[in-house]
């Protein structure tokens, strides 16, 4: 079925394709695979492990001449995790560039994605939008390939330009007889614009941001913190949020620093908790949220001081290309009840 759909697309999308002419200079065949499936498939949430549209480009590395480009605005009848192409190329080192999920009405690029974009234009693109869903996650892949034989095979792994926060809430074992109800989880300073090249780690200016909430009508009663964490999987998260990378340059939080605000009832008494998404031992990118990373946030209401204890663990979507760049460790930090003053989060 997948091959049949691809055959239909080749026919229907030919007007958006810049083919390679069969000249004597084109002495090699390049077979490449676009792959979006994460190393750990357990990290997939909904459709964020697949794509529904794809823009492809092949450039000469030396002079950045585009030898091939193709826009596939829609894959039907189903989304894909992998896509392959085989094209004739000249015997020069190539740069393959791919953008997945580009054809989304909520995305606005600084320059419209078209078959005739240069490599420089692609690497300087910025993108903005108003909202995220699991089905519109922007992914970009870039791969340098040496054409050193008549038949060359390459794989282009895709990086997600977002971070995802999965928030799981529980109550301490000591609160078994207490009623703990969560009314809302708010993610403050969700970033809505980014540089589309994963290699550009700065943030565009001005920064576009907003606050988003998961509201539980009637409240959600918290269960006890389980000893078996096998059920801690994305589909069981109380809330999941996406954001473009949020780089906080200093060890001191600023107005753009991301944090969460949780409203809960403890035996009928209302509390609001606020805290940054970091841990006590973290020094590099202490307050940042990095692209291509899933953050597992375990939040537990504790007794007797009504503390909210949080354990945050970042997982690279792709182990070889995450911005984390270090071994992952789990550290606890605590959030104190929020007193209404936004000046000081802990």
Give the location of each predicted region.
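Extracellular beta-sheet/turn segments enriched in Thr/Pro/Gly and aliphatic residues
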Residues: 119-161, 168-172, 280-338, 343
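Tryptophan-paired
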Residues: 40-111, 164, 173-291, 342-346
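Bacterial signal peptide processing site
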Residues: 14-17
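Signature of extracytoplasmic/envelope-associated structural regions
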Residues: 86, 93-142
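C-terminal motif of bacterial Sec signal peptides marking the signal peptidase cleavage site
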Residues: 9-12
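Sec-dependent signal peptide recognition
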Residues: 1-3
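A short, amphipathic beta-strand motif
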Residues: 28-36, 165-171
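Acidic, glycine-rich segments characteristic of secretory precursors and extracytoplasmic regions
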Residues: 19-23
